[in-house]
Structures are given as structure tokens and as C-alpha cells.
Amino acid sequence: MQVLVRDNNVDQALKALKKKMQREGIFREMKLRGHYEKPSEKKAREKAEAVRRARKLARKKMQREGLLPMKPKPVFGAGPGAGRGGPGAGARPPR
């Protein structure tokens, strides 16, 4: 795999390389090959992945047909933990 380094901009080239590797699935493959996986474990993992893919496709199809509500788009600042962590939040009373 190759990337061009333009104007000695190594950071940009590294970013492009990482993007290519991510798209090709190299990081995932490295993680899987990091240790031996028994054939039975491989079979179970692949089956679980297939089930996950099938469920995701079915969910998307139902959403397109209007049987399920569409996933709401996240509103920044109103997610989990909103309203917590402001000034004085978690302050303990004096002893």
C-alpha cells in the first residue's frame, strides 16, 4: 500500500495511509490475527457476525417501510449526561 508525501507533509500522508488501511480492513485483520483462533471459535464468530448483519438489514428494511420509527439524529448537548457537570455540580457540603 502506498501514499504520496507531498511537500514533506508526513502528517497528511500518514492520515491518508490510516484511512486506506481502515477502508481495506487491515486493522480488523491484524486484531483477528494477533492470536490463534480455534476453528470452532472462528465459526461461532462468523455466525454471530452474519446474524448481526441480517438483523441490521431487517431493521433498516422495516424503517424504510415505515414499520419502525427512524433512528433520531443526536442533538448535541442533550444526550446522556446532559444537565450534569456544570459549575458546582457534585460539590460536597462542608464538613
Curated annotation (Swiss-Prot):
Record keywords: Ribonucleoprotein, Ribosomal protein
Gene Ontology terms: cellular component: ribonucleoprotein complex; ribosome
GO molecular function terms listed in the Swiss-Prot or TrEMBL record: structural constituent of ribosome
Protein origin, superkingdom: Bacteria
InterPro entries: Ribosomal_bS21, Ribosomal_bS21_CS, Ribosomal_bS21_sf
Keyword Ribosomal protein attributed: yes
Keyword hit for Ribosomal protein: yes
Positions with biased composition (Gly residues): 78-89
Gene Ontology biological process terms, A to Z: translation
Disordered, as annotated region: 55-95
Listed Gene3D superfamilies: Ribosomal protein S8
Family as reported in the entry's similarity comment: Belongs to the bacterial ribosomal protein bS21 family.
Protein name: Small ribosomal subunit protein bS21
Species per Swiss-Prot/TrEMBL record: Nitrobacter hamburgensis (strain DSM 10229 / NCIMB 13809 / X14)
Lineage: Bacteria, Pseudomonadati, Pseudomonadota, Alphaproteobacteria, Hyphomicrobiales
Gene: rpsU
